[in-house]
Swiss-Prot record:
Gene name of the record: Usp47
Similarity section: Belongs to the peptidase C19 family. USP47 subfamily.
Phosphothreonine modified-residue sites: T1016
Name used for this protein in its record: Ubiquitin carboxyl-terminal hydrolase 47
A Pfam family per the record: USP47_C
Compositional bias ranges of the Low complexity kind: 882-900, 954-970
Active site: C197, H503
UniProt organism field: Mus musculus (Mouse)
Upper lineage: Eukaryota, Metazoa, Chordata, Craniata, Vertebrata
Region annotation (Disordered) ranges: 426-452, 835-863, 880-971, 985-1025
Length: 1376
């Protein structure tokens, strides 16, 4: 034997033991290597491909031994992603940016450990372009990897990305390149828009038909005659040219469908390929009129058959000639459990005659009597392209389901049709036979119809918006030889799925190479005869007859054969044989494709990143998207951003620069000094679809210089606090390092703010309302909780406040107020003449509450006779405070007055608007009535619906420069001048002084379960005293002029308020500005969509409000406990709009229906102009638009009638005395249908004593005069008034249900308000001409659209497939 190398084991004679020892030694060495490899640290590499936007979201993960050479890393990555090694770069990510990192050397033998990779940690790398050139694909030209997956797959392919995910993204790379690269088969696929697979399979079949494609190429489009967008033949020409010349794997069909007049929604409609075939051929015939291709469809696809009836007694035969475009073949005969085995068997069954006997006898014109006869079909002429439809869809009348028949039906590759043609009939048709009028032009036996498919009625029925007429058909030559009827199969359209839906694709034989291909949307692959046999149908194992209702299977649905005739069989036109206009079209499409390719390349190398800029003048943050080529330098990118933000006339270009920015944290990460000539692709770390950071176009003043931002720095916004003025200044930005101490940080702030560092206090706001005093000088900022972006408050006043505990200090209280203050814009009620009387009533309602505390410092208003808003507010709140103290003294036993929570009685508060010394008062009831009736317009303009609490809980604090208590509008003045003035005027015991106190206050935001029964919180307790929160927090109001203007008489307030205040207290503060008590106005919150919702829960805080929210104040009495605001609408049963809003009323628990009607009468008279007596109208339940239970006068709310917030009720005016006396009665709305006149009578109400159908029939007979036995009725469908087209009502409703009572299926009439249609069964339906029908359809459509009802009621009605010849859907309802 030949001696081996050192690592080979070569056995020698008589050395068995030595050989065995060598084997053991070798195995031991291998085990040691494995053991060492297991112990060796490993490096986890995570690679992101940034070379294009499609793969940027993918990650490649490699876990390699630390000793692996760098070159091996490149090889592994290249194998993973399918790139050629050496055509891409790998760049390390250092945690901040990849811009400063040099690419790794793909030839280096240095180990990963020596290349500074960290074992045991994640090492992130970016795969980038090499020298500006994109990586080269290993299989870019052939795409063998792609096609290997689908090469033999002819069924529906899985959606891209649905394959189980691995860390390699080869499949993902395929999904991108598959659109750009042509299949190895040489054929181009079609993109499925959504559910257009049926369209794709037909288009590919037509494209692979030489006769059709060549004829289409010969047709020339005339620009002057038609718009190319709406020309179906021209768009098919373009599509075929692209299918023949494009280098893409798949092309779009949107231009073709647009020429059909389809919008994007049509792509989501499932249709039948056979239906599309006929509709498309009809449309092409119309477009090709008066051209060489006018008769193309008939020449290629149209055949003839004879429909005959032969008398068996005298032999007389009546017949007519029908044309067809396809032959529908039954899979399984009706009533049989056995399917036809083959297409030939089904064809024989198709022409098998049937005997007409018994009751189906035929009336013979010659015998002049009914005789037995034979009825059948005979083929007279077969088309050049024979289309066979296999009728796999059927309806199962047992289960009432549509089913698919998956039975096996074989079909041959070559089909001899000579046995099915009746040559004798074609040679010499019987002279005595009778031809029906119009038989020559009556159409085809297409689909399920054997005639009249091209008739006008059919065109409307199938939705083809054209008047079709078949041209004269050439009669087949007599003496046709049988051997010339051999057909060759070349297209099989396959349906995969069930009767509920599925997928179409086509298996097509190419006449160029005689190979079969699967055209499955964008995927084209080569298949074999074995794959074709799989489409014959059938399944392994036994399957019941009805199991196919929901079964999914793949089988042939449509077959297309071509006649084997060497004299007629055409070949595809070669390029040099193209007509001149097709050559021009090819060149034009190539140029467009090249342009698209260049554009894709540009997109592939374009960095798209968010760009922000703080406008130097407006001080508004602007946002845009910067799209810059990766090779553009930073300097060029700055110029692009400068122009994009429209700063040319605002600031010089040299005062702008781009910096790395984190918009979420408002953090400037780094600046790019000295990198003005660096490409943006390198700065941004490659081309990506999304970036983890943004860019900021930073600006400066001409006399300033840019600050350098380095990675690792943190940004701090410093707010200077002035304790004396109680102000918080706008922020100053300071950059620091996390390893700096608090002492060093103070020195840094001192330089920026010029405050002394020795007495400086720094408070860090780590999150909302979380304040932390930095009291440890030696602690680092990182230890104190600093992050990328931070917010601190500093102050350096040398006061005794330094000695107090932080949570008890003045600084903490000021910052706490600052954090919880929001700005609201309040729209006050219109200052109309009616408002003056309301204010007067408010003034009279108050009593003298005593003099204002003389120790309070009064705020002086502006010069003039009128007091300022601030002065009014100051005076009002002083009176409220004084009254509160008086109340506390009266109660006496409530404990410490500083902790008192007793609320004041607002009925005794004197308004600051009152005249001094006025003591006149009015009764509360009179006051309420006066407010409600003095200005009805205010009530008409009120919001139509109230609402429960709005649950959004945003917690936004006001900007630091907004708040300043140095203004003159603080709510309460200081009771003790020696105390440090606080924001709300109370001493330090009255404000929250710890987080625990705030937490307890937060409980006020929960629902008040004690008031749930009334649907809202009452402003008054059972004793009538106010429940408003007396802990007055910060409130400041200033006059405000809205930009958009609110109209004359309206007034705005800009209110700064502590959002922990309750709604009750907030309303109390607004009393002086509204001019009425808080119980007589309502607060509506205005949302961004200008919708208004009433805020009603008085014990809740304003924490759900945020900065700059708008509030509208409307006059109207607030609800008390047990009261509900009810929306009253008028029911007008015979009006076009049966529901009309009248007014908002207040109903109370325990009130009877009659009492509520008594209260409604004066309101209806004054506000709606309705003068009604109490017995001439009723109230009834309203459920959306439907009238319901009739409420009787003695019914009691909350006992007999459940009532809730946002309740609605119908008010119905009666023509006579109320007939409803008892709940056992049933009120039904009836309407007579008159078919002879095609109209509906007005509604009439019937009151039944029981739910008996017999009683209903009797009552209907009484009011209509129709005999009892001729009454037919049906329940209306949908919402009131149950409108339905008069064209559909006679057939669509379920007339005369077989029931004896109304409360059972299918009626289920158990409550008042049901709609019943009735008719006289002896009355015939009016016969309409087409013109009358179309006119009536238009009128009905217009009527029903106005009432919001559909023209027809048809559940799950399939939408007809249409092709619009004018390029857009016809709005004429008649075409629907």
């Amino acid at each position: 034997m030949v001696p081996g190398e050192e690592n080979q084991l070569v056995p020698k004679e008589d050395v068995f033991w030595r050989c065995r020892q060598n084997i053991f030694d070798e195995m031991k060495k291998k085990f040691l290597q494995i053991e060492n490899a297991a112990e060796e640290p490993r490096v986890l590499c995570i690679i992101q491909d940034t070379t294009n936007s499609k793969t940027v979201s993918e990650r490649i993960t490699l876990n390699l031994p630390a000793s692996t050479p760098v070159r091996k890393l490149f090889e592994d990555v290249a194998n993973k992603v399918g790139y050629i090694n050496g055509t891409f770069d790998l760049t390390r990510e250092n945690g901040v940016t990849t811009a400063d990192m040099a690419p790794l050397d793909h030839t280096s033998d240095k180990s990963l450990l020596d290349a500074n990779f960290e074992p045991g940690k994640k090492n992130f790398l970016h795969l980038t372009d090499k020298d500006g050139e994109p990586p080269q694909m290993l299989l870019e030209d052939s795409n063998n990897v792609d096609d290997s997956v689908h090469d033999r797959f002819i069924g529906p392919l899985p959606r891209e990305g649905s394959v189980a995910s691995t860390n390699d993204y080869v499949s993902q790379n395929y999904s991108y390149s598959s659109i750009l690269n042509k299949s190895e088969t040489g054929y181009v696929g079609l993109v499925n828009q959504a559910m257009t697979c049926y369209l794709n399979s037909l288009l590919q079949t037509l494209f692979m038909t030489p006769e059709f494609r060549n004829a289409l190429y010969k047709w020339e489009f005339e620009d002057s005659e038609e718009d190319p967008v709406t020309s179906i033949p021209y768009q098919l020409q373009r599509l075929f040219v692209l299918l023949q010349t494009s280098k893409k794997r798949a092309i779009e069909t949107t231009d073709v469908t647009r020429s059909f007049g389809w919008d994007s929604s049509e792509a989501w409609q499932q249709h039948d390929v056979q239906e599309l075939c006929r509709v498309m051929f009809d449309a092409l015939e119309q477009k090709w009129k008066q051209t060489e291709q006018a008769d193309l469809i008939n020449e290629l696809y149209q055949g003839k058959l004879k429909d005959y009836v032969r008398c068996l007694e005298c032999g007389y035969e009546g017949w007519r000639i029908d044309t067809y475009l396809d032959i529908p073949l039954v899979i399984r005969p009706y009533g049989s459990s056995q399917a036809f085995a083959s297409v030939e068997e089904a064809l024989h069954a198709f022409i098998q005659p049937e005997i007409l006997d018994g009751p189906n006898q035929y009336f013979c014109e010659r015998c002049k009597k009914k005789c037995d006869a034979r009825k059948g079909l005979r083929f007279l002429h077969f088309p050049y392209l024979l289309t066979l439809q296999l009728k796999r869809f059927d309806f199962d009348y047992t289960t009432m389901h549509r089913i698919k028949l998956n039975d096996r039906m074989s079909f041959p590759e070559e089909l001899d049709m000579s046995t099915f043609i009746d040559i004798e009939d074609e040679k010499s048709p019987q002279t005595e036979s009778c031809t029906d009028s119009g038989a020559e032009n009556e159409g085809s036996c297409h689909s399920d119809q054997m005639s009249n498919d091209f008739s006008t009625d059919d065109a409307v029925d199938e939705g083809i918006c054209l008047e079709s007429s078949s041209g004269s058909e050439k009669i087949s030559k007599p003496g046709l030889e049988k051997n010339s009827l051999m057909y060759e199969l070349f297209s099989v359209m396959v349906h995969s799925g069930s009767a509920a839906g599925g997928h179409y694709y086509a298996c097509i034989k190419s006449f160029s190479d005689d190979q079969w291909y699967s055209f499955n949307d964008q995927h084209v692959s080569r298949i074999t005869q074995e794959d074709i046999k799989k489409t014959h149908g059938g399944s392994s194992g036994s399957r019941g007859y009805y199991s196919s209702a929901f079964a999914s299977s793949t089988n042939a649905y449509m077959l297309i054969y071509r006649l084997k005739d060497p004299t007629r069989n055409a070949k595809f036109l070669e390029v040099d044989e193209y007509p001149e206009h097709i050559k021009n079209l090819v060149q034009k499409e190539r140029e467009l494709e090249e342009q698209e390719k260049r554009q894709r390349e540009i997109e592939r190398n374009t960095c798209k990143i968010k760009l922000f800029c703080l406008h130097p003048v407006k001080q508004v943050m602007m946002e845009n998207k910067l799209e810059v080529h990766k090779d553009k330098t930073l300097k060029e990118a700055v110029e692009m951003a400068y122009k994009m933000m429209d700063l040319e006339d605002v600031i010089p270009l040299d005062c702008c620069r781009l910096v790395k920015y984190d918009e979420f944290h408002d953090y400037l990460e780094r600046s790019y000094e000295g990198e003005e000539d660096t490409p943006m692709g390198l700065l941004l770390g490659g081309v990506k679809s999304t970036y983890m950071f943004d860019l900021l176009l930073e600006t400066r003043k001409p006399d300033q210089i840019f600050q350098s931002y380095k990675p690792g720095e943190v940004m701090v916004k410093v707010h200077v606090v002035d304790l004396k003025a109680e102000t918080v200044a706008a922020p100053v930005t300071v950059r620091a390092y996390l390893n700096q101490t608090v002492t060093e940080f103070k020195q840094l702030i001192s330089k920026a703010t010029h405050l002394p560092a020795d007495s400086m206090r720094i408070v860090l706001e780590r999150c909302y309302n979380d304040l932390r005093l930095l009291s440890m000088p030696s602690k680092t900022l990182k230890a104190e909780g600093f992050f990328r972006s931070n917010k601190v408050f500093v102050e350096s006043s040398e006061t005794v406040d330094h000695q107090a505990a932080f949570t008890d200090s003045h600084l903490w209280k000021l910052l706490d107020r600052h954090a919880n203050t929001i700005r609201l814009f309040v729209l006050l009620p219109e200052q109309s003449p009616g408002s003056y009387s309301k204010r007067t009533a408010y003034q009279k309602a108050g009593g003298d509450s005593g003099n204002v505390d003389d120790d309070c410092e009064r705020v002086k208003g502006p010069a003039g006779n009128l007091k300022s808003v601030d002065a009014i507010l100051e005076e009002s709140t002083e009176k409220l405070k004084s009254l509160s103290l008086q109340q506390q003294q009266q109660d006496g036993d409530n404990g410490d007055s500083s902790k008192s929570t007793e609320t004041s009685d607002f009925e005794n508060i004197e308004s600051p608007l009152n005249e001094r010394g006025s003591s006149t008062s009015v009764d509360n009831r009179e006051l309420e009535q006066h407010i409600q009736t003095s200005d009805p317009e205010n009530f008409q303009s009120e919001e139509r619906s109230d609402s429960d609490v709005n649950n959004d809980r945003s917690t936004s604090s006001v900007d630091s420069d907004i708040l300043s208590s140095s203004h003159s509008s603080d709510t309460l003045c200081n009771a003790d001048s020696a105390q440090i003035p606080l924001a709300n005027g109370l001493d330090s015991h009255s404000i929250t002084s710890s987080r625990r106190t705030k937490a307890n206050e937060g409980k006020k935001e929960t629902w008040d379960t004690a008031e749930e029964d009334s649907g809202t919180d009452s402003e008054y307790d059972e004793s009538g005293k106010s429940r408003g929160d007396m802990q007055y927090m910060y409130f400041k109001a200033d006059p405000y002029t809205a930009d958009e203007g609110s109209g004359e008489g309206h007034k705005w307030l800009m209110v700064h308020v502590d959002k922990r205040i309750t709604l009750a207290a907030f309303k109390q503060h607004l009393e002086p500005f509204v001019g009425v008590l808080s119980s007589h106005f309502k607060v509506f919150r205005v949302y961004t969509s200008n919708q208004e919702f009433e805020t009603v829960r008085l014990n809740e805080t304003l924490s759900s409000f945020s900065d700059d929210n708008k509030i509208t104040i409307r006059l109207g009495r607030a609800l008390k406990k047990g009261e509900y605001r009810v929306k009253v609408c008028q029911l007008l049963v015979n009006e076009q709009e049966p529901c009309k809003f009248l007014l908002d009323a207040v109903f109370a628990k325990g009130m009877t229906v009659r009492q509520s009607k008594e209260e409604l009468i004066p309101q209806l008279r004054e506000q709606c102009g309705l003068d009604l007596s109490i017995d001439r109208f009723r109230l009834r339940k309203k459920t959306w638009k439907n009238p319901g239970t009739v409420f009787l006068d003695y019914h009691i709310y909350e006992e007999d009638i459940n009532i809730s917030s946002n309740w609605e009720v119908f008010l119905e005016v009666l023509d006579g005395v109320e007939k409803m006396k008892s709940m056992s009665q049933l009120a039904i709305l009836t309407r007579r249908w008159r078919p002879a006149e095609m109209k509906l009578d007005p509604f009439q109400e019937l009151v039944l004593e029981s739910n008996s159908v017999d009683e209903l029939r009797e009552k209907l007979s009484e009011i209509s005069g129709i005999p009892l036995e001729d009454i037919e009725f049906a329940k209306g469908r949908g919402t009131f008034p149950c409108d339905i087209s008069v064209l559909d009502i006679h057939q669509d409703l379920d007339w005369n249900p077989k029931v004896s009572t109304l409360n059972v299926w299918p009626l289920y009439i158990c409550d008042d308000g049901a709609v019943i249609f009735y008719r006289d069964r002896t009355e015939e339906v009016m016969e309409l001409t087409d013109e009358q029908r179309n006119e009536l359809m238009k009128k009905e459509s217009s009527r029903l659209q106005k009432t919001g009802h559909r023209v027809t009621y048809s559940p799950r009605k399939e939408k007809a497939l249409k092709i619009y010849l004018d390029g857009a859907p016809n709005k004429d309802v008649a075409q629907d």
